[in-house]
């Protein structure tokens, strides 16, 4: 069964002529990121150069190459918080796992500029650090048509293939962008679980290795059309989505053994229309429809020799528990917004707006067990989000600027109704050309993922491990303060303090009646973090680029449990380091070697300990045919040690969960077409 483990909107302001001149003056021939002074505490990066040298194919992997970005539980994090993404000024509102699929279908070569806003203002309509992507639009001198085709093959104990195509057409006021990706093959994952006797429902230790083989076929696509009416009227229509089909085969070994077969499908349709008017008003509507039906048949044979140590070995019998599980999940999203921004006299700017979102879920869960019979559960909650905001910004000469905004957030679910007022204040000072000192204080909301609260338990590990969903999860409230300094050469130094109430984390407790261990998502009473980070890029001539990111944080989690649950009052200091290096081995032919390394000391998430781990990725890139073709060889997780282990300590015994690490090797080829008139 699928299982989620500890899961834990920007309008592009038109730059002034001074900033335009400043940007042109600071376009380096290297990959060195340049900090540029922008309202909203944004730092702009010349990412396309680094993407070209590393040979990165898609937008999702390009975001991972940004300084300061780390990965936690398969999710991109920035300053200890999950990121949000905006594409051409439009924040993406689909869930993170759905957004991940869409970004993988978009070509990285289309990126023109990337901005990072660590604490976005209310006008940016984001509750997390924002990665604002701007894609190339072309001009009168550009070619009317460009295209890119590519394919890749990767091996991680099974072979996975991918084909992709993207194209851009521009003529006069009209532009059209298309991207499509098809992925197919087999994926093998292995999950190892060690349950000590103090937590075991049988009184003895349980060790289980679960191998999951998926035959997958996935289609991802995006179509965006923009038409400029008159001088400054702009109409944009975007359609994006994916369709995936997985046939699963699962086997359990060690303490108990058995098998499972399943079929998992999912498809997403997301459409939006945005309209910009010349006097600073924008409005838009959006709809998304997501479907994810599943069907699993589990045949589980329990070995008595390890589950019941005192059982007479001369009477070997096997107890059988088989069950059929079907689940049908539907999610419908509707969203509408209106926003305005106007420049006033003496450097003042005012912005205002409001948006409304309605999300309707529907899930029906059928379960038929060999012993307990037939069971049906269903959930059909609705979520309503409403936000209204107003803000002002002011430039005090060429060196100082400030921005302040206030938003009123309303959230409603069948058992919850909440109002919150969230302020944001930022001030930036430029002591000299290219250096920026910023202070930001902000408040934001976090909302639990629907899969964490759909009220339907999901069995795993042969039925001895259950992930229990709960509808009682509440939205979390976050307050952040950050002080940062960015230099002209791209160095960044950052200190932050985060405080959250209601942060969602996963807890566990044994259930003797159900004879299983239950994993349940809970709202942590208090989550605090104080962190430091330094980003230090450097260019050595024209042949070597390096970027070293060092960070550390003090984190505290506190949770007062109810009956049978585990209390949490953890404090820990941990550090992490990330290194990126790109060496040009030869200019003719154009060959470059890329090395990415990441290391982290022991840390903790709620009741779970994460021992220290490290990961090393390497790739070799060759550009030929006048740099219109790129061949890339890569090996991810070279040391086979990049997958963290999640451990819960009971006295001197550990309950361990770990995906078995495997090296990931492959080759990709990309061809660019067009680009010349």
Q: Model regions: which residues?
A:
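Short, acidic, small-residue-rich periplasmic hinge/interaction motif at the N-terminus
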Residues: 2-51, 71-73, 80-82
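Extracytoplasmic beta-strand/coil segments of soluble accessory domains associated
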Residues: 60-95, 123
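Gram-negative outer-membrane beta-barrel transporters
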Residues: 523-603
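Outer-membrane beta-barrel signature, preferentially recognizing the C-terminal barrel domain
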Residues: 445-495, 499-501, 518-531, 536-539, ...
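Short acidic/polar hinge/loop motifs at secondary-structure boundaries
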Residues: 92-118
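N-terminal periplasmic accessory domains that precede
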Residues: 5-13, 17, 28-32, 59-62, ...
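C-terminal beta-signal and adjacent terminal beta-strands/loops
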Residues: 622-677
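Face-selective signature of the C-terminal outer-membrane beta-barrel domain
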Residues: 218-245, 261-436, 489-498, 528-553, ...
């Amino acid at each position: 069964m699928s299982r989620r483990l500890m899961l834990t909107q920007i309008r592009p302001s038109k730059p002034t002529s001074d900033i335009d001149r400043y940007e042109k003056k600071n376009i380096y021939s290297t990959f060195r990121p340049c900090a540029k002074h922008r309202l909203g505490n944004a730092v702009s990066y010349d990412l396309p150069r680094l993407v070209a040298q590393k040979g990165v194919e898609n937008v999702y992997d390009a975001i991972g190459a940004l300084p300061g970005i780390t990965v936690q539980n398969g999710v991109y994090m920035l300053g200890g918080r999950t990121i949000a993404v905006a594409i051409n000024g439009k924040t993406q509102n689909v869930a993170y796992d759905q957004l991940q699929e869409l970004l993988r279908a978009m070509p990285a070569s289309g990126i023109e500029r990337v901005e990072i806003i660590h604490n976005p203002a209310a006008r940016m309509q984001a509750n997390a650090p924002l990665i604002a992507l701007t894609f190339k639009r072309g001009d009168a001198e550009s070619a009317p048509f460009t295209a890119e085709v590519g394919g890749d093959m990767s091996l991680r104990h099974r072979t996975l293939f991918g084909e992709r195509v993207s194209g851009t057409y521009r003529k006069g006021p009209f532009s059209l962008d298309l991207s499509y990706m098809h992925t197919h093959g087999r994926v093998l994952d292995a999950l190892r679980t060690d349950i000590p006797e103090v937590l075991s429902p049988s009184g003895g230790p349980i060790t289980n290795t679960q191998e999951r083989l998926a035959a997958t076929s996935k289609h991802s696509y995006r179509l965006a059309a923009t038409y400029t009416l008159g001088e400054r009227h702009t109409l944009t229509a975007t359609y994006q989505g994916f369709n995936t089909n997985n046939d699963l085969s699962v086997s359990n070994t060690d303490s108990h053994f058995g098998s499972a077969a399943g079929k998992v499908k999912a498809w997403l349709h997301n459409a939006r229309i945005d309209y910009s008017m010349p006097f600073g008003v924008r409005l838009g509507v959006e709809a998304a429809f997501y479907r994810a039906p599943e069907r699993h048949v589990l045949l589980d044979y329990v070995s008595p020799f390890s589950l019941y140590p005192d059982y007479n070995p001369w009477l070997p019998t096997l107890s059988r528990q088989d069950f059929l599980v079907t689940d049908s999940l539907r999610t419908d999203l509707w969203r509408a917004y209106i926003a305005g921004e106007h420049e006033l006299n003496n450097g003042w700017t005012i912005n205002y707006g409001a948006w409304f979102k309605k999300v309707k879920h529907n899930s029906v869960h059928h379960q038929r067990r060999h012993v307990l019979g037939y069971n049906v559960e269903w959930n059909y909650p609705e979520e309503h989000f409403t936000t209204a905001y107003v803000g002002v910004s002011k430039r005090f000469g060429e060196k100082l600027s400030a921005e302040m905004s206030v938003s009123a957030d309303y959230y409603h679910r069948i058992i919850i109704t909440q109002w919150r007022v969230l302020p944001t204040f930022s001030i930036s000072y430029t002591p000299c050309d290219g250096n920026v000192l910023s202070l930001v204080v902000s408040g934001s909301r976090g909302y639990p993922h629907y899969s964490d609260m759909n009220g339907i338990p999901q069995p795993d590990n042969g039925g001895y491990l259950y992930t229990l969903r709960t509808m009682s999860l509440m939205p979390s409230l976050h307050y952040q303060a950050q002080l940062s300094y960015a230099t002209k050469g791209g160095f960044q130094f950052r200190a932050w303090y985060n405080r959250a109430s209601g942060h969602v984390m996963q807890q566990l407790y044994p259930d003797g009646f159900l004879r299983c261990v239950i994993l349940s998502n809970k709202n942590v009473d208090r989550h605090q973090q104080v962190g430091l980070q330094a980003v230090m890029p450097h260019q050595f001539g024209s042949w070597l680029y390096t970027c070293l990111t060092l960070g550390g944080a003090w984190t505290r989690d506190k949770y007062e449990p109810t009956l049978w649950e585990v209390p949490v009052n953890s404090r820990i200091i941990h550090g992490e380091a990330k290194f990126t290096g790109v060496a040009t081995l030869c200019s003719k032919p154009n060959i470059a070697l890329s090395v990415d390394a990441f290391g982290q000391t022991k840390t903790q998430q709620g009741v779970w300990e994460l021992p220290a781990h490290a990961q090393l990725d390497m790739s070799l890139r060759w550009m030929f045919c006048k740099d219109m073709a790129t061949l890339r060889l890569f090996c991810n997780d070279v040391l086979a040690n990049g997958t963290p282990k999640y451990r819960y300590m009971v006295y001197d015994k550990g309950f361990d969960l770990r995906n078995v690490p495997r090296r990931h090797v492959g080759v990709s080829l990309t061809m660019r077409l067009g680009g010349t008139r």
